[in-house]
Amino acid sequence: QSFLYNVLYASNFFHYYIWNKQNRNRGMYLKRALYLPEVWFFRDGAHRKCDVISCAAPNLSAVQEYRPVSKEENTEILRSRIAFILDIARENEVDHLILGAYGCSFGQKAEEVAEIFKGCIQERADSFDAIIFAIPDRENGNYRKFVEVFESKREYCSYTAG
């Protein structure tokens, strides 16, 4: 659980989400993000502050409603957005980064997302002490694909830079 909603509401960040809904860019959205420092998270009686980056993933599933997007264009947008998120974290001196299967619930293929993450992380290898992918092991196969791309559960679950 977190206070993320409270932070967004209290800080009047909903205009960000409304703007994204009005500017869908064929379902690909645009390269915009919110960096929210020190959001409270609670779990099993413990609490901790973490910074949060909110950035709309390219929604490949929604593309069918709009003009088609080529595979190459989708890949480039996805790569650009993932690099953008990592650069925001680096610029804000985040040392431990927790990521998810970015865009996979919007039709992006887990293997491609993992490959792009791996390449972008390698380009920024000295930027983070640790990167953790928090991906539930469900029937959708996202976890398994990330493990395969990152070659082992240890490297995948707790990728240590350097």
Residue ranges and their predicted role:
Residues Q1-G162:
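Macrodomain-like recognition of ADP-ribose-binding/processing modules
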